[in-house]
Amino acid sequence: MKKQFIAAFLGLTVACTQALAYLGPNDKDYKPTVKPKANCSPATARLTMKFNDVSALIEQGGSMFQNRAASVAAYEVPKGSNRFAIFAGALWMGGTDVNGQLKLAALRYRSGNDFWPGPLTVTPGTGNFNPINPVGDDAVRDFGEANIDPDQCIAYDKFYTIRKAEVIKFNLWWECNAGVTTEGCDEITAPSNDELNRIYGWPAHGDVSRGQDYFLAPFYDRDQDGNYNPDSGDHPWYDDILGRDDIECGIDRRISLYGDETHWWVFNDKGNIHTETNGDPIGMEIRAQAFSFATNDEVNRMTFYNYELINRGTQTLYNTYFSQYLDADVGNYADDYTGCDVSRGLGYMYNGDLIDESDGGKLGYGENPPAIGCDFFEGPYQDADGIDNPGPFYDEATQTEVVPTVVDALANNGIVYKGIGIGYSDGIIDNERFGMRRFTYYTSTSAYPYNDPGPAAEYYNFMEGQWANGSEMYYGGLGTGTGGSQTLSDYMFPGTSDPLHWSTQGEDMSGLYPNGWDETTSNNPSGDRRFVQSAGPFTLRPGAVNNITVGIVYGRSTEGGLMASVEAMKRADTKAQALFDACFKILSPPDAPRLTIQELENELILMIDNPISSNNYQEAYAEIDEINITDPTVDRFYRFEGYQIFQLKAQDVSIADIADPDKARLVAQCDIKNNISRIINFQFDEALGFSVPVEKVDGENSGIRHSFSVKEDAFAQGARALVNHKTYYYVAVAYAYNQFKEYDPTDPLLLDGQKIPYISSRLNYDGTAISPTSAIPH
């Protein structure tokens, strides 16, 4: 292996006391003030996420999930189905200055522009942020003029894509080159030129000569000199690799990278005049990352988005809200319902009937269509008030869950559900963060003020929890106060998700709505719904750093009523929430071994091994499951147990299909010789509505082997011998085992046992997606 770096040739609201609406019910006139502009051209970069079973188009200029050129939806799930669940999405943000002037940036369909590429200018030394050290809740980034030059908008009109596997590969290669380690170095291959270009071209630093913040995209600073230098082992920063855990989850405010594949970009709201909303600019710099994971469960049909929002301007904004807007069209756009789960901080869209018809040439989902949701995991920091604001917590002394009353929570700026905030009743003062505090909606075909917003003030009214004209939203019916109650509600269509009546500030509505309030119980006409999830109000100070993290979750039931797919989506969301709670440190099963095949006459010799890049190197895999096994007193580790090799029917069969005997069949298996052989998982069956036992492996329990002779075609009819000069396809997976407690659905004492004792590979030994290995006997 060469000892020199390939890098050498790369050359590389008003004041807090006011709560008025910004438009009255009969006032639709709005004249934006003249504001300075940087004359940046609109962003043009776009990218399609497609690492897992979702294909999602995103744009540098803030527009999400929309193919604007064709005016069609571009969030496809499952990938390759030609069926789409979301038409558009974007961030909204707004607040008022000391004079009551509204500042706002938002998008719907990007018919205009409120966002442009690139970082904004700052005055060095105005903040206290240092990414080398852990960062607490008093973090302030540099702020200043908050401007940008047009050439810098052009320079940053791009995405920076990186994969965790590439960073791991670079680390191992660098450490061997630098003499940090010699173990396994003979097996280490150099990163490709493309991989090195991505690492050396990582935008770790802004141009200080142009007034930009020196620290830009997150990077791992191996020698802690504050400078990004891959020659010294620095690289894009994933905090969950190679045994590292530098960022204390939930405490340290530094941002690292997440996901198996990550797309990072930076944009702002000061590049030019706001032509989408006509709002006055804030001076906001947004550092975004879109990421996903390849798995063999529901996470494979999820995507995630983290936004680090920095107020680079010198003005303080009051009554500020940050919001996630989503125009989710489940197949056919015209027949949807919307709703939310208050306790989860989850907004969702589902079909208004049990058949999603096609719309012209755009395919619907057909019978039992899915539901799509957006979980608002975390939002901005709540204003400091010198106390640890109340929220649900587990009392170790009494071993019970303690939940404050709605009255107590409202009086002390607390919460009553874990899913709508972070940092409450955790013993730490002033680290509380908002979750989803408003859920509003509108319909494209409705009359004003129940339809799309126009000027900035109408966007802001939806963010505050009001209709476009500033009129209130009510519990029941369509939320208009007609056909429902006269009780105000912060959340539209909560269903039965709010047993503590948080949305109505403690007023019990179960007498009027014994089955909860959703679109089905109100018999609403379905339509083209859009929704807004908001966090706030809070005070946005110069240099303030906030984060929004959201996840798009998908669920589909094979039978049941209108809410069946919503319930399936919520089950998926439980995994999404657990993944967020673990700071996206996903449980990684043992990597698939390297599979090589020797071709003989009417015979194939399949050989497996685990290079040093594998998490199962020397078959020593052991991984803690912090997502599904939450009891710290039990054994939470999965440990390597064995291998399985499958013959695939065709080259296009994926790892997700290995349980389908029409597509994949087991041809070889081995496992450690111990007391573990037959392993059964209990998996939820949508049709039956409960978990059923599924045999995952019937182990031969004869010890580990690394070569296997295959002489028969598992798919052959009649004569089964392998045919010379015919192509066959195989995949090998490793599996691990944990049974901290036996599970038995018939025994009340064992209902909290391990339902999933078996997990198998989701990625290759080198971090890439698992793909078939072909062989031709001859």
List each model region and its residues.
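Extracellular/surface-associated beta-sandwich interaction domains
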Residues: 22-778
